[in-house]
């Protein structure tokens, strides 16, 4: 009797929710695209985003059958990433050599621009954004710039922390610059 009760409980807890879950079925379609530089998809979603050879961001909400440009993104983008910790809804679009980037929290339905207040020497570098695994609003920006000073290559970084992009605060960390002689 206890065994039957345990099996019934297991069925109710594990199998019943799986039977009622919405089915995600990946679909592969062929679409004529001239050039594509970067193609990513959100986790468990039919939404895909790609960059063309000119840095224009295209989005498809139907597994690549139809594509449209993202109107909110005005600049040329050089890299797009899906957040590794919040990949079902969040993505980042980065502008080359700029502290400005775009973020979406709804699989590309809407976009907002954020700017990291990096110092002038970092304007020719790039910033990489990381989020906290449990706190989605916590953004960490690592901005770097390669500078040559008297035949020595410096690879300094500036680290910024933000609560959902408002505002980014610079962290003053006690580390030394990494030097490489040319």
From Swiss-Prot:
Gene3D superfamilies in the record: YVTN repeat-like/Quinoprotein amine dehydrogenase
Name of the featured protein: Uncharacterized protein YCR101C
InterPro entries for the chain: Sortilin_N, WD40/YVTN_repeat-like_dom_sf
Chain positions of BNR repeats: 58-69, 102-113
Keywords: Repeat
GO cellular component, one term: membrane
One Pfam family recorded for the sequence: Sortilin-Vps10
